[in-house]
């Protein structure tokens, strides 16, 4: 991203950086939607199968002391810290990459930045 900012500054006096924070981004990804988007990428079968296996038939329960809760199925969320987590989120949010001409978007996992070259920046006072 620093390289992109430097390039934009070579032809524009300012670059506005919009940082977007999606609340609970990893928790809101539905597995069925993600797998549908992965299918649209036309990846080789072994790659698709890896994702499908990772997101299919997941469940969880809580053990506290000697007690175990009811087992619940999981049909949404990406496991944070997993190798497929950041890639899965980027695939899921991939259709959010349309920006106006001249602007750039940079994403990694749930961090999204939009770079907007500008010739004038006006300070807004409260």
Regions found by a protein language model. Give the residues of each.
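Nucleotidyl polymerases of mobile genetic elements and RNA viruses
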Residues: 1-126
């Amino acid at each position: 991203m620093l390289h992109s900012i430097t390039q934009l500054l070579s032809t524009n006096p300012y670059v506005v950086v919009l940082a977007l924070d999606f609340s609970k981004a990893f928790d809101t990804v539905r597995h069925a939607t993600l797998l549908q988007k992965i299918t649209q990428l036309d990846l080789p079968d072994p790659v698709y199968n890896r994702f499908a296996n990772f997101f299919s038939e997941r469940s969880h329960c809580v053990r506290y002391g000697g007690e175990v809760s009811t087992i619940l199925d999981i049909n949404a969320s990406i496991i944070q810290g997993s190798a497929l987590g950041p890639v899965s989120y980027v695939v899921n949010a991939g259709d959010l990459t349309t920006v106006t001409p001249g602007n750039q978007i940079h994403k990694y996992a749930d961090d999204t930045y939009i770079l907007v070259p500008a010739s004038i920046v006006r300070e807004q006072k409260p």
